[in-house]
Amino acid sequence: MMQDWFRNAKLGIFIHYGIYAVGDVSESWSFHNGNISYEDYMKQCEGFTASKFDAKKWAELFQKAGAQYVVMTAKHHDGVALFDTGYSDLSVVKKTPAARDLVKEYTAAMREAGLKVGLYYSLIDWSD
């Protein structure tokens, strides 16, 4: 059953963010489709600093745009979690120079701005 707030929401934002923000790789489907090897894809972890990740600025922008909710990928098909997970060591917290829980920062900033928070967590995991 759809919640009333969602039915009435006019604008929502969906953020695909991950280690593929480093280079010229278009999201995690690149290695699945054979455009890049899994090993080369995962090398992006070495350069993932999240230095331009600013959840508060995003929240301000989304609020100004009139968004009522925001959904972010917490873990996409590549298996790289954007949060500190006890399930695997494959996270931006443990495997990248960023060493930050981006989901925690995102969630806090969106809620502080009065935006509803959603998370996309892929059950598909090509890292297994």
Task: Give a label for each model feature.
Residues M1-D128:
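Mature catalytic domains of secreted/periplasmic carbohydrate-active enzymes
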